[in-house]
A protein has these predicted regions:
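Entry beta-strands of beta-propeller and related beta-repeat scaffolds
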Residues: 51-56, 110-115, 169-173, 227-235
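Trp- and S/T/G-rich repeat-edge/linker motifs of beta-rich repeat architectures
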Residues: 1-42, 49, 62-102, 108, ...
């Protein structure tokens, strides 16, 4: 990716007769136009909020972590866009500072959007704003996770919030980038009074424990999360040639902790799945 590559394209009738139109990128960044051309390298995350709003997370380089939104019915490159987050102070209701590199993950519940940031150590934070109310770069934002806030993960340790999934007022975050960083954290009452607990990572990988972080098979990051009913599925990745990419599952209606409730369902040839590569 290079500067100017961050674009959003829309496909209509994509299941039968696909037609594509560019709806974001290469604007001026002002007066309703999308973000400026020749500036942003990557659209790192996308989500539809409440069925009506397209939310786009940008970034790769320092200061590029911005959140833009547009009504799904009226997005074009030059109309309908609003910058909602980024380039602020990170305090007093303002969004994150202009040193943050990337919005790696997005999740929503109703009109509330959760934003996962980061590239470098200490940037792995989660922010919340209600798009149904006031949500601008300088108002409406609350940091809910990271920097030990609300009993969350340590400051200056984790690089990215790789993945997010929300169910009602509960949010799950997948962290990581470097050895032993692949963890899943759960936030309860995340829309009002957030409280975090670690539910995956740093286990032994056997007897119901979550994935291990032993020498030679240390998991780097939780690249993906999906929630189907009460089943939380986790995509955990390690260095090429060690454990590779694995899929794990836990029933969140029961006990899910780092050492209880987990089952590996794919990877390392398990259940006729893929092997270890690299």
């Amino acid at each position: 990716t290079g500067a100017g590559d961050a674009e959003v394209w829309k496909c209509t009738s994509c299941d039968s007769t696909p037609t594509w139109t560019k709806v974001g990128g290469d604007g001026t960044g002002s007066a309703g136009q999308s973000w400026a051309t020749n500036t942003y390298e990557e659209v790192a995350s996308l989500i539809i909020v409440n069925g009506t709003t397209l939310a786009v997370g940008l970034g790769t380089s320092a200061g590029d972590a911005e959140l833009w939104t547009c009504a799904t019915s009226s997005c074009t490159v030059t109309t309908g866009w609003t910058k909602r987050g980024g380039d602020a102070t990170g305090s007093g209701g303002q969004s994150w500072s202009n040193t943050i590199d990337e919005i790696r993950s997005l999740a929503s519940s109703g009109t509330v959007i959760y934003v996962g940031t980061g590239v470098t150590a200490g940037e792995a934070d989660v922010w919340r704003c209600d798009l149904g109310g006031t949500c601008t770069t300088t108002s409406g934002w609350t940091q809910v996770g990271g920097d030990t806030l609300n009993t969350s993960w340590a400051s200056s340790t984790y690089e990215r919030v790789w993945s997010l999934v929300a169910s009602g007022t509960t949010v799950y975050a997948g962290l990581g980038d470097t050895a032993a960083d692949a963890e899943v954290w759960k936030c309860t009452s995340c829309d009002t009074s957030p409280s975090w607990s670690k539910i995956g990572g740093d286990g032994t990988g056997i007897s119901g424990q979550s994935w291990g972080n032993v020498s030679g098979a240390s998991f780097l990051y939780v690249s993906s999360l999906a929630l189907m009913g009460n089943q939380l599925f986790v995509g955990a990745s390690s260095s090429a040639g060690t454990s590779g990419a694995e899929l794990w599952r836990c029933d969140v209606s029961g006990t899910c902790s780092t050492t209880v409730g987990w089952t590996r369902v794919a990877g390392d040839y398990l259940n006729d799945s893929w092997g270890v590569y690299g």
